[in-house]
Amino acid sequence: VIIGSLTISTILVFFIVPLTIVFFIYLTNILLLIYQRNNELEADPLSDVWNRVRKTIATFWDIYARIWHGYELHGVENLPEGPGILVYYHGAIPIDYLYFLSRLFLWKKRLCLSVADHFVFRLPGLKLLLGVTGVIPGRREECLAALRRGYLVSISPGGVREALFSDQSYQLVWGKRKGFAQVALEAKVPIIPMYTQNVREGYRMFKERRFFRQLYESTRLPFTPPYGGLPVKFRTYIGKPIPYDPNITTEELVEKVKTIVTVLPRIKQVHKGKFLFSFQTKTAVQALISKHQTIPGNIWKALLERFDKRRK
């Protein structure tokens, strides 16, 4: 009886935190609706008139990030003043990305637009929240328009597929996606790589998921439930921008970004410099890999890093 109770309790704990995140997201949208009604706002969701409530939302999520994950953000200085495309690794639950958006707004008063999968826009009751926080579809025209208006635009080429079917090896699941590179070349903007340490240790997907893979490929809906929510250490690293180069092809740019995001968690020593010299990003890479991601990911190590005050 005791063992059974403990098992049930453990299962509940592993699902409570992800469900709590969903609850807070919907609560945030309700607060936005109240704010909109009280202030009789009908402005463009991307307008600065929403900055006051954006700051409130960002402050809440930043406090949550500090308490639950000891969240740190490094490399903000690598973000261009103007437009650019942020390319990042997609965790099982991209809560780390929400932390990044919140801290970026608090530190820089800057709104980064986020490309999301189509299913996100079908979620009930989140229209206002998605608009005010700058979540947009991944259509080429919308991305180009945002970049021409001077926004940072973020995208995870792996998207939902990477969230569901990558694992503790942190392998990228990009397939043949290269739209982000085409947009960057057309808009003549840099691409900035980004990843969060231990994101797969915080939230995971079940390993036996062949059925869910087939289900996703046929429906494009994420039926695989995430679990976890352990208070592991999260550190987001922003790498040095890959500048616009009119002589590079889309395929070469895709591979360049893919190599950076893949190799950053694996390089164990600064003197392994072929990667650094090849892509001329020595300073940024050294900052990112000063404390590398353990491959495969290790939950216990990620938890213990909460007590390690040295910068990773």
Locations of regions flagged by a protein language model:
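Membrane-anchoring hydrophobic helices of lipid-metabolizing enzymes
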Residues: 1-103, 108-134, 138-141, 209, ...
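Non-catalytic C-terminal accessory region of glycerolipid acyltransferases
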Residues: 1-35, 49, 53, 145-312
